[in-house]
Amino acid sequence: MDVPTSSTDSQEVKPIMPIRTKAACKFYPPHILCGKGAKTNKRGKRGGAQKASTKKDIGETTPPVAKKSKVAKEPTMLAAAAAPEAAASPESSAAAAAPEAAASPESSAAAAAPEAAASPESSAAAAAPEAAASLESSAAAAAPEAAAAPATPAAPEAAAAPEVAAAPATPAAPEATAAPAAPEAATTPAAPEAPAAAPAVEEEEMVWEAAAVVGEAAVKPPEEEPTSGEAVATTTMT
């Protein structure tokens, strides 16, 4: 009876020893398993390793918080930098539009003055209604094109309009050729500005009536006039 018990005790003790040294130390404190030898056990080293790992984890977790705060500050700096730019852009656009608006009536008036002075008012008064209707259609058709076109190319056209209008007015052919070229130069600077569009169109209609009277007196075919073709094309597109 004693021998089997001793054999069983020896069999039970053998598997407990490796568990005490390797696996059991992970789940039980060292003073229960190892007793006095707790100081020399690996548990202390593992505890130190765990403490170091916890410190590393703490060190790894803190920098992302600082990075998030920096990222949160960067959009505010970008927004603060974009605010003055956005505030300056309307001013620059308004400042750029102001000289154009100021120059467009002057250029249109300068282009209209020589034509009004050169056109004879006493010729063909019966053709005025037809000329007024054609001018209204051409001005209405040219308005969207002038609004879509940029303001920079309109400046050379406006500058070239007085030169074309200042041509010698003795023969009737130069006046007829200057009449179709003038509407584009006069409508383009006036159309981009909404407030100045209405009075400019009214003045242009008066000028084009006189120019159309001169063109009809010269009996020039409509195919040679570019404005008539453009007006028909734009009306069909609209």
UniProtKB/Swiss-Prot annotation:
The keyword Lipoprotein does not apply. GO terms for cellular component: cytoplasm; male germ cell nucleus; nucleoplasm; nucleus. Residues 79-148 are annotated as: 4 X 15 AA tandem repeats of A-A-A-A-A-P-E-A-A-A-S-[PL]-E-S-S. Residues 35-238 are annotated as: Disordered. Residues 153-194 are annotated as: 4 X 6 AA repeats of P-A-A-P-E-A. Its main location: cytoplasm. It comes from the Eukaryota. Residues 79-200, 208-220 have a biased composition (Low complexity). One of its GO terms (biological process) is spermatid nucleus differentiation. It is found in: Cytoplasm; Nucleus, Nucleoplasm. Sequence repeats lie at residues 79-93, 94-108, 109-123, 124-138, 153-158, 171-176, 180-185, 189-194. Keywords: Cytoplasm, Nucleus, Repeat. Residues 39-48 have a biased composition (Basic residues). The keyword Protein biosynthesis does not apply. Signal peptide: none annotated. Specifically expressed in testis (at protein level). This is Testis-specific gene A8 protein. It comes from Mus musculus. The lineage of its organism: Eukaryota, Metazoa, Chordata, Craniata, Vertebrata.
